[in-house]
Structure formats: structure tokens, C-alpha cells
């Protein structure tokens, strides 16, 4: 195999082809000789019985190749008989077993003892820490490949769908649904959060606010002059109402309505059939809707004769022929 650190640009480990298996022993020896001097200062390097010193970045592709292909099948790449080939294959497998053990030990040993986190957190944290005595971009790529494989294996066996585990290495949370940043909501939590935010401005709250504003208006009784002084007397009005010199308008018990924010004033001395419905339009403006034409005539004559600057009467024959507007220009309310 030509390059012992065969790692593609995407991080996938490239295993040797079948025709390259025969040169595995030579490649292993060359790799050991090449990296022996580079990692001579690393006290954690191991000896492998055959005076081979192997670092874990170099061990990864050779380990995978040895376990996949086993002993060499072509004799022209080696010197010796069949028994020598068999012995050579066993030696490589024995080295591969030691490489596997040392790779696991060294991955854990790179994490400081005072961190004391689980294995998956340690492997993830070691990816973000600078490694001492490691040179070359290919070696770093091999290290990341080792940690990625270990991380996927640990997460698949140690984390269930109902358990979310925080990894302090780079502030990630791993769940059965995938990996997300700490503090970010899961996909199943996004829909309820948006629905709760959308319900904050319900129209019921606005209607309640309008009713509250109308209920704070002063409910003072309004007096109307003697009915005999209004329009010369209407024959259709009740006699009991015409005989009274003075009357007072009081709000009834059904004063404020929650739906349309209106007040209903009933003329108690006239009877329950005579009333005025007052609806709030905007600041200082109200709409008065008489119950019948008799009440409309009385109010119209009173406003024209009493205080035309204070009262303003309008009619809309298309929408509501009995609709009237009341414009309030001063803060105090005088008797009509």
C-alpha cells in the first residue's frame, strides 16, 4: 500500500486493494521507521515486541487493513516459504491486536485526569484540544477519523430516545433524534412554542380591554326637562310620561355588554319599551341608538333646543336609520 495514512478528503478511511495486500509487511515496517523519530519524545508510545514503535494515527489504516485481509495471499512479495508467510500473517494480526488496545488507551489518555467525564465526552473534547507532538495535516485527519468512529459507536449504544445527555466538550446535547446546540429547542418543541406565542394577542383580550375602558366611564344620571316643554306633546307618548315634570335616566343592570362594549339606558318612567343603546366609537364619540321613533324625536328636539354645541345628531339611512352620534367636547358632563 502506497500511503499508510490513506484518508480521503471527506474523512473516510480508504482500505488497501487486494493487489496491495502482499506489501503490507513492508509498508508496516516503512511506516514504523518513518514515524519512529517523529514521536521519539512522546513518552506514551508503546513497543510492539518486534522493536516496532507505532503511534495511533499511523495505526488506524494498518489496523483496518490487517483485520480485513488477514495474512498475505501472494508469495512473490515476500521472501520465505509457506510457513514463513503464515507466521508473517500471524505477526501482523498480533500487532493489529496490540494497536487496537493502545489506540483505545491513548485516546482516553489524551484527556486530562481532572476532567473526569465519560468516554464519549472525552473523545469529543479531545477533538477541540491541541495535540502535543503531532505534526502534519494527515495525522490530524486520522485522529479526527478515530474519534468520529468512537463517538458514533458510544452514542449508538449509550443514549436512548428518551434520554438527553449533555456533552461539555463543545456544548452539544445528543438525543435519539440527533445532535443540537445546547439551549436550542427540538423540532417537536417548536410547534407548541409558536402556537403559544401566537395566542398572546387573541381578539378576546382586545375586547376585554375595550369593555374595561367603557366600564371606567362615569355613570352619572342624566336628567331631561319636562316632556311637555319639548315638542308641544306627542299624542303617541304615554299619558303617565307626559304628566311627570322631570325624569331621570339610570343605567340598568344589563349596562355593559362584553361583545359590543355598549350601554343600554332604559327610561323607567316611560316603561321597558323606551330605551337608548350607547356604543363607544372612539375617544369622546358615542353612537346613540333609540329603541323606537318616539324616543328618537324626544332626543332630537332636546338636543336642538338645549345645547347644540355639545350635541351632534347624524343619520345613516342605508346602514341604520336610527343611529345618532354624540360628540363629547369637554371633560365634565352637564345636565341636558
UniProtKB/Swiss-Prot annotation:
Transmembrane region(s): none
Name where it's found.
Cytoplasm
Coiled-coil annotation: which residues?
A: none
Q: Which domain of life is it from?
A: Bacteria
| Keyword Transcription regulation belongs to the record | no
* Biological role stated in the UniProt entry: Involved in a secretory pathway responsible for the surface presentation of determinants needed for the entry of Salmonella species into mammalian cells.
Name-wise, this protein is Surface presentation of antigens protein SpaN
Q: Which organism is it from?
A: Salmonella typhimurium (strain LT2 / SGSC1412 / ATCC 700720)
The UniProt gene name for this protein comes to spaN
